[in-house]
Amino acid sequence: MIQMQTTLDVADNTGARSVMCIKVLGGSRRRYAGIGDIIKVSIKDAAPRGRVKKGDVYNAVVVRTAKGVRRPDGSLVRFDGNAAVLLNNKLEPIGTRIFGPVTRELRTERFMKIVSLAPEVL
């Protein structure tokens, strides 16, 4: 469950280390984002020679949440922290590698690239 001002780890190799959610996209009064939702983020901490700089604003897709996601069979998939993957304006991943597991809920046509780059799909 991600809302405005939530800080997330970055699960790709763009050079960003942590980001802050500045808007949950999809609806004028939408408050929360879950796994697979697109959010607007600001870079809060970045590596010196990365692709992105501190203060830049990007789209991102949420790939892991501490709240987790409920499956139709009743099981719950949860993670230790919140993580996102940075996207460009065409909603394609900026990085070329994904770190850590992602959930099966990302297997939509929009995010198949992220699923194929991920080392583990839960």
Swiss-Prot record:
Q: Which SMART domains match?
A: Ribosomal_L14
SUPFAM superfamilies per UniProt: Ribosomal protein L14
By its UniProt entry, which Pfam families does this protein fall under? Ribosomal_L14 (PF00238)
Kindly list the GO CC terms recorded for this protein: cytosolic large ribosomal subunit
One biological process term in Gene Ontology = translation
A GO term, aspect molecular function: structural constituent of ribosome
Q: By its UniProt entry, which PROSITE patterns does this protein fall under?
A: RIBOSOMAL_L14 (PS00049)
Keyword Cell inner membrane listed: no
Which residues are listed as membrane-spanning?
Answer: none
Q: Keywords in UniProt for this one?
A: Ribonucleoprotein, Ribosomal protein, RNA-binding, rRNA-binding
- Function statement: Binds to 23S rRNA. Forms part of two intersubunit bridges in the 70S ribosome.
Q: Please state which protein family the record places this protein in.
A: Belongs to the universal ribosomal protein uL14 family.
Which protein, by its recorded name, is this?
Large ribosomal subunit protein uL14
Q: What organism does this protein naturally occur in?
A: Dechloromonas aromatica (strain RCB)
